[in-house]
Amino acid sequence: MVGVGSRMGWNEAVASGRAMLEGVERIRLPGAELGVELAGLDWGGEGELVVMHHANGFCAATLAPLAVMLRDRFRVVALDARGHGDSTSVKPGPANEGYDWETLALDSERAIAGVFEKTGHDRVALAIGHSFGGALLLRVAERLGPQIERLLLCDPVLLPPLTHEQIAVRSNGAGLAAATRKRRNVFPSLEAAYEHCSTRGLFADFTPEALALYISEGMAEDQTGEATLKCDREVEAAIFDGGAFAAVAEGVGEAAAQVLFVHAERGNFIRAYYEEVAGRMPNASVTGGDFGHLFPLESPATAVEFVDSMFEK
């Protein structure tokens, strides 16, 4: 797998990334409340339904390298969370209102109902959630029961209950939310954004297509060509803040799906906690590998291996 460290140029990378969106239908789906719509990418096809959800701060299009590996077997639809990609964005309230994880999970639940209506499917054969997207889809699986048949959770954001002191440290110290609020979000051009991100450790191992789609689909150009992230830094930070309060795993015993937790051994989450949560579920297991938290964007073929393992059972 070629990473951005190979220095594929912008023109080649964006052309290769956009080719992965050829034939894709851009759809609008209902959110949790009136006036909020989620954007989706529908790769079409006649197979069983696969629904994917991205990590915080990214967008549905970054999962295109994974989608194109599945589209010959499945009907693949990827969702943009509110405030991301082309979904409706609302301003976070003082206590992160609008971006609490219960609301975001309800967005996904309503959007999946919209996918059912659009595609004619009445169940999801496989839901794939990366990071915060995994946490949201776990919550959806608790609510939809047998309508979610399989759930692949790629290093999901699942945290043991935190004290108020721990929450304060996470939210206001050197945590992800604080770092996000300082991150650069405006660039002279899309190409300049690609060149900048290519030098940053966060994106070092992305496939060129995933990074190019993060830039071309996750940023908006103005009339001068200046590019700004569609996901406002305050939105991304509000979601990180809200994760400390999320009771995602409270109702996991209600999830009827076959669930596979994938732990990134070079990530920051706790495998033992995944195993504790899986132990409360009727049909869940935990595996892992020598990769980092962003592995679906770095090695989509690895994610496909986990998909294949779930359909072998």
Regions found by a protein language model. Give the residues of each.
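Catalytic histidine neighborhood in serine/cysteine hydrolases
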Residues: R280-H293
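Helix-rich cap/lid subdomain of alpha/beta-hydrolase
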Residues: P161-T224
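Active-site loop/oxyanion-hole signature of alpha/beta-hydrolase fold enzymes
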Residues: L34, A81-I128, E305
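An N-terminal hydrophobic leader/cap segment in hydrolases
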Residues: M1-L29, L41
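Conserved hydrolase catalytic core segment
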Residues: D122-Q166
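Conserved HGGG/HGGXW glycine-rich cap/lid loop of the alpha/beta-hydrolase fold
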Residues: A39-K91
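Conserved serine/cysteine hydrolase catalytic core
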Residues: E209, M219-G279
